Structure formats: structure tokens, C-alpha cells
């Protein structure tokens, strides 16, 4: 049985973004809503509420505006892939088509950090690096635990600790500007 390709969402960014948060591929709920991290149990927006004061209960459009105001950008490493359901483990590896980051990275001159949201994102990032993607030396890369509800190995508090550490290290690096 053939599985249709799932296509990701467009990048959410602005030229002054300092942090680019990269997921793997949006789940079914997010794709249907055309919204990043739309699943009600995904902890992404609650994590950003704790880190950057972005109210997780705002309408999606308002959360995106607040995200941009905080100089954060969003995208996914996988632009398209075959997948049954929403789990990253259901992605057919041979079908993965990575997004082209070369153009986006040129549009982000203030970029200071790339945050990889979960293990699948980290693996896809490694593939991009092997394919020749290069970042300016000042850009830090953080592999973070997934905000997905499927990643239950860590509690919200534990995930928040990792995400907060990345946030603080990114801010500390930027204090010299």
C-alpha cells in the first residue's frame, strides 16, 4: 500500500530572528490546522510561555506575532516524507526530503542559535551537515528533548530545564551585542 507524502508548513521567521527552532515534520493535527504545534498535548507553546512569556492560550496568530517579537523563528527540517499518522517513528526514512536551509539562513543575519526539537530533528540536522550545510561560527546548535506528547520519557519540568538552559546560553552569548 502506498503512503502519500506529507508536506510541512512554511517557515515562520523575520530578519531579526536570533533563534531558529526546528522540528521534524508537523503531525496530522498541525497539518490539518496549518499551525505549528497544534496538538493540544504538545508542550511547545507551554515551554515558550515559560521561557519567553508567550501566552500559550492566545490565538495562534497572536502566538506567532509574539514569537516573532521575541526574535524566534520556526520551521521543520523535513519538508516532505511518507508517514502514516503523526509519529516520527512512522516516517519512511527513504522518503525524507529535507528543507533547503541555504536561502533561509541567508535571510537571518542576527541568528545566534538553532534549537533542534527532538531526536528526529537532530538526526535530520546531521544529514544536512553531511550534505554541506554550514553555519556561521557564532551560531550555537542545541539538541533539545522533543516537545511532543509522544516523548513521555521526560516530564514537562525536565524538558523545561533543557530548553531553559539553551535559552539562557543563547541570551548569555548575545549580551555582548
Residue ranges, per PLM feature:
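Short, surface-exposed acidic-centric catalytic microdomains
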Residues: 29-92
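Short, hydrophobic/glycine-enriched beta-strand segments
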Residues: 18-24
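C-terminal capping/extension of enzyme domains
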Residues: 1-11, 39-40, 87-102, 126-177
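Internal catalytic-core helix/loop-beta-alpha segment
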Residues: 69-124
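Hydrophobic packing residues within well-ordered alpha-helices of enzyme cores
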Residues: 48, 124-125
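A general structural motif
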Residues: 16-17, 110-112, 138
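Short, solvent-exposed loop/turn segments at secondary-structure junctions
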Residues: 26-29, 43, 79-83, 119-123, ...
Amino acid at each position: 500500500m502506498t503512503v502519500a507524502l506529507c508536506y510541512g508548513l512554511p517557515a515562520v521567521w523575520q530578519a531579526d530572528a536570533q533563534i531558529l527552532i526546528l522540528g521534524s515534520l508537523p503531525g496530522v493535527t498541525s497539518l490539518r490546522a496549518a499551525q505549528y504545534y497544534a496538538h493540544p498535548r504538545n508542550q511547545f507553546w507551554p515551554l515558550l510561555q515559560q521561557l519567553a512569556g508567550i501566552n500559550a492560550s492566545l490565538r495562534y496568530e497572536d502566538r506567532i506575532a509574539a514569537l516573532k517579537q521575541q526574535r524566534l523563528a520556526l520551521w521543520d527540517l523535513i519538508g516532505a516524507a511518507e508517514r502514516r499518522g503523526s509519529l516520527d517513528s512512522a516516517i519512511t526514512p527513504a522518503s525524507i526530503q529535507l528543507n533547503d536551509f541555504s536561502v533561509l539562513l541567508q535571510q537571518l543575519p542576527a541568528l545566534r542559535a538553532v534549537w533542534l526539537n527532538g531526536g528526529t530533528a537532530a538526526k535530520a540536522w546531521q544529514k544536512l551537515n553531511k550534505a554541506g550545510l554550514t553555519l556561521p561560527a557564532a551560531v550555537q546548535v542545541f539538541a533539545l528533548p522533543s516537545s511532543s506528547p509522544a516523548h513521555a520519557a521526560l516530564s514537562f519540568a525536565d524538558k523545561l530545564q533543557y530548553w531553559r538552559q539553551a535559552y539562557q546560553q543563547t541570551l548569555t552569548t548575545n549580551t555582548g551585542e
